[in-house]
């Protein structure tokens, strides 16, 4: 559903932000 898509997008966005901030 739409909610699932939004949650998935937020998870991906969160990981992207963390990857950008942390020197991994």
UniProtKB/Swiss-Prot annotation:
Say where the protein is mainly found.
secreted
Mind listing the UniProt keywords for this protein, alphabetically?
Antibiotic, Antimicrobial, Fungicide, Secreted
Q: Where is the signal peptide?
A: none
Q: Where in the cell is it found?
A: Secreted
What tissues has this protein been observed in?
A: Expressed by the skin glands.
- GO terms for CC? extracellular region
GO biological process terms, semicolon-separated: defense response to bacterium; defense response to fungus; killing of cells of another organism
What's its job? Has antibacterial and antifungal activity.
Family of this protein: Belongs to the gastrin/cholecystokinin family.
Query: What is the protein named?
Result: Caerulein precursor fragment B4
Q: Which organism is it from?
A: Xenopus borealis
